[in-house]
């Protein structure tokens, strides 16, 4: 009976793995603080000025000039940041986590993206973005960088590490570059400015980091229960 309880507790604990290893939690907290700071600084600047900032004046023309040579890309890249594709990619991440029994990862993917998109569309845009026609932060950038950040969190410390570290790093960089490409395409077609894209990236990544740290905290509490129960029963 005792052995069965220990086996059950071990299986449950393996399914409730922490998303971020210990040394990376402090780094995640620092990155989260940076994302919050960037969002606040850009938001305050936008509210206090109706004119384009020096960042937009410096980067927007360069981005548009660089990407104007690729009209085909500009036709389909922005579509990936719309609600439908973002929802499908989110469901794919949730399904992958469920198949591999990464319950914490499934919770992260299921909640972080909707929270990030909802924060952008229903809180930040109506309040901060109202000064510039509700363009800040970019919803496309928010969704894509949230997905990229989730990929990074899921691949940083997978359960069995069957995928080599170099391949995992390449996958994360690919996800980040794809997010950058979608955000840049929105700037190139004039739908957003560089500031909007940076703000969306900060919101998307920041929400994912906040959710990952919260999920890990809850997971740690849940893992303590099964570990302590057999000892108390004996």
Name each model-derived stretch.
Residues 66-77, 98-103, 128-132, 157-165:
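Short juxtamembrane and helix-loop transition motifs at transmembrane-helix boundaries
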Residues 6, 11-25, 95-103, 152-160, ...:
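Structural signal for the C-terminal ends of transmembrane alpha-helices
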């Amino acid at each position: 009976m005792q052995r069965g309880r220990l086996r059950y507790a071990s299986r449950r604990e393996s399914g409730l793995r922490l998303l971020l290893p210990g040394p990376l939690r402090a780094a995640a907290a620092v990155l989260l603080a940076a994302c919050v700071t960037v969002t606040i600084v850009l938001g305050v600047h936008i509210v206090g000025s109706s004119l384009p900032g020096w960042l937009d004046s410096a980067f927007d023309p360069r981005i548009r000039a660089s990407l104007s040579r690729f009209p085909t890309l500009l036709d389909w890249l922005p579509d990936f940041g719309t609600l439908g594709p973002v929802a499908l990619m989110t469901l794919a991440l949730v399904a992958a986590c469920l198949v591999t029994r990464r319950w914490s990862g499934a919770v992260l993917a299921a909640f972080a993206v909707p929270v990030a998109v909802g924060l952008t569309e229903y809180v930040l845009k109506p309040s901060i973005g109202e000064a510039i026609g509700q363009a800040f932060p970019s919803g496309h950038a928010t969704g894509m960088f949230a997905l990229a950040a989730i990929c990074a969190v899921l691949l940083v410390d997978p359960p069995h590490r069957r995928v080599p570290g170099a391949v995992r790093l390449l996958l994360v960089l690919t996800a980040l570059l794809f997010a950058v490409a979608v955000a840049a395409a929105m700037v190139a077609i004039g739908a957003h400015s560089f500031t909007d894209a940076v703000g969306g990236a900060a919101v998307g990544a920041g929400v994912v980091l906040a959710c990952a740290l919260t999920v890990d905290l809850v997971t740690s509490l849940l893992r303590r229960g099964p570990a302590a129960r057999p000892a108390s029963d004996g």
